[in-house]
């Protein structure tokens, strides 16, 4: 699993926990639906930290809370 995969999975998990759709999340966060769809569908292999921060703000969580998930602890180190 890559970091981008983990971010995608975490966003989906957070939406499921809060029972909101990706469309609703985009509205709450003030980002475009296409940006969120690109992240979700793998079109964005390197989501910007600023975008992740907007998602966190919309969900009323910190970046630390976003990344404090088992998903990120299991990542293999990416070397490019």
Predicted regions: what is each one?
Residues 57-65:
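Intrinsically disordered, low-complexity basic tails/linkers immediately adjacent to helix-turn-helix/homeobox/MYB/SANT
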Residues 43-57:
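Short, basic-rich loop-to-helix N-cap that marks the start of a DNA-contacting helix
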Residues 1, 38, 45, 67-80:
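Short, charged recognition helix plus adjacent turn
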Residues 1-20:
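A short, Lys/Arg-rich alpha-helix, primarily the initiator
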Residues 14, 28, 39, 69:
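Residues in the recognition helix of alpha-helical DNA-binding motifs
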Residues 12, 23, 53:
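Residues within the helices of the helix-turn-helix
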Residues 19-38:
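Short alpha-helical DNA-recognition segment
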Residues 15, 26, 56:
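The alpha-helix within a helix-turn-helix
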């Amino acid at each position: 699993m890559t970091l981008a995969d983990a971010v995608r999975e975490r966003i989906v998990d957070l939406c499921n926990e809060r029972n909101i759709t990706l469309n609703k999340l985009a509205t709450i966060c003030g980002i475009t639906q296409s940006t969120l769809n690109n992240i979700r569908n793998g079109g964005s292999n390197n989501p910007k930290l600023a975008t992740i921060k907007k998602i966190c703000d919309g969900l009323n969580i910190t970046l630390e809370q976003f990344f404090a998930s088992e998903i990120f602890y299991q990542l293999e180190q990416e070397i490019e």
